[in-house]
């Protein structure tokens, strides 16, 4: 079994974890409805994606 020969310093540990941060979600304004939605995702209110009807719209 592999065992570390030296203790990992907090600086090295934090440098290794520097790429683990979560980024903020991006939103775009929908051309048809004007609502905000995630890019490359289906609009859940209308059920449209890329100009095509994918899902049946939710009834409110």
From Swiss-Prot:
Coiled coil: none annotated. One of its GO terms (biological process) is translation. Residues 1-60 are annotated as: Disordered. InterPro entries: Ribosomal_bL32 (IPR002677), Ribosomal_bL32_bact (IPR044957), Ribosomal_zn-bd (IPR011332). GO terms for cellular component: large ribosomal subunit. One of its GO terms (molecular function) is structural constituent of ribosome. Keywords: Ribonucleoprotein, Ribosomal protein. Residues 28-44 have a biased composition (Basic and acidic residues). Gene3D superfamilies: Single helix bin (1.20.5.640). Residues 1-20 have a biased composition (Basic residues). Pfam families: Ribosomal_L32p. Belongs to the bacterial ribosomal protein bL32 family. HAMAP family: Ribosomal_bL32. This is Large ribosomal subunit protein bL32. The lineage of its organism: Bacteria, Pseudomonadati, Pseudomonadota, Alphaproteobacteria, Caulobacterales.
């Amino acid at each position: 079994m592999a065992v570390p020969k030296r203790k990992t310093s907090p600086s090295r540990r934090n440098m290794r974890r520097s790429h683990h941060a979560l980024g903020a979600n991006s939103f775009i304004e929908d051309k048809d409805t004007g609502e905000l939605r995630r890019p490359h995702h289906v609009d859940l209110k209308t059920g449209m994606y890329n100009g095509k009807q994918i899902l049946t719209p939710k009834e409110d």
